[in-house]
Design a protein with these regions (language model features):
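Well-ordered, non-membrane alpha-helical segments in soluble/globular domains
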Residues: 40, 63-64, 112, 174-176
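A solvent-exposed, acidic/Ser-Thr-rich amphipathic alpha-helical stretch
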Residues: 71, 75-139
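Short, low-complexity N-terminal intrinsically disordered segments enriched in polar/charged residues
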Residues: 20-66
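Short glycine-rich, low-complexity/disordered patches
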Residues: 46, 50-66, 70, 128-134, ...
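A short, hydrophobic secondary-structure junction motif
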Residues: 66-80, 177-183
Length: 206
């Protein structure tokens, strides 16, 4: 009987430890993390608008492309998965469009290729803006870091000709994998850093 009680107690303590690892964030911590994730997403959206704009020079776009890559885990290069340690080919992004009023996922591209294609789009002007407020799912702990999913709504508009006539436009709902990882540097010391991950398309509408 004592042996059974001891085993039960050990299992209970194990469960409490797991729960403590998952729920060791205060409401203030969670809100601070969500605020920081929102800031990083806004930075990414701003970078995209510069890269898509035909008013920006190639030199300026090179700077903003580098800035955009720094927001992502691996910075567009292959990286080790934080969960299983396996080598990943780099952050991937789904792209989509609407055809006959229906959402179609065109394919999945590496982040670097997506940014290069955005720069080279054959429009006289491209506008990428935030169509709605972002949403961030529950933040949960995985090993020594935290993860979450951010949902954004992005409006795309492509214009042609000197009269700047809109040729194409859509609003896409996207889910972004988010990593909140511990980092240490000489300036900030030990701190939490937000990195974005793979981006998938949920839906695209006109």
């Amino acid at each position: 009987m004592k042996k059974i009680f001891a085993i039960t107690l050990m299992l209970l303590m194990s469960t409490l430890t797991i729960n403590a690892q998952i729920n060791d964030l205060t409401e203030q911590d969670i809100q601070a993390f969500k605020d920081r994730v929102g800031e990083v997403i806004d930075m990414f959206q701003n970078n995209l608008s510069i890269l898509g704009s035909k008013k920006s020079t190639a030199k300026v776009k090179a700077v903003y492309k580098k800035s955009a890559l720094k927001l992502f885990i691996g910075e567009g290069l292959p990286f080790k998965d934080l969960n299983d340690g396996k080598e990943r080919p780099g952050v991937q992004m789904q792209v989509s469009k609407t055809m006959n009023g229906k959402s179609t996922v065109v394919g999945t591209k590496p982040l670097t290729e997506y940014l290069d294609n955005l720069i080279k789009l054959p429009y006289a002007e491209v506008k990428l803006t935030k169509a709605d407020t972002y949403r961030i799912s529950n933040i949960y702990k995985v090993g020594d870091h935290y993860e979450a999913t951010a949902t954004i709504f992005q409006r795309f508009e492509g214009y042609v000709g000197k009269e700047m006539k809109k040729k194409y436009g859509d609003v896409t709902q996207k889910n972004i994998r988010v990593y909140i990882v511990p980092e240490n540097d000489y300036v900030l010391g030990q701190h939490w850093s937000v990195r974005l991950g793979d981006i998938e398309v949920v839906d695209t509408t006109n």
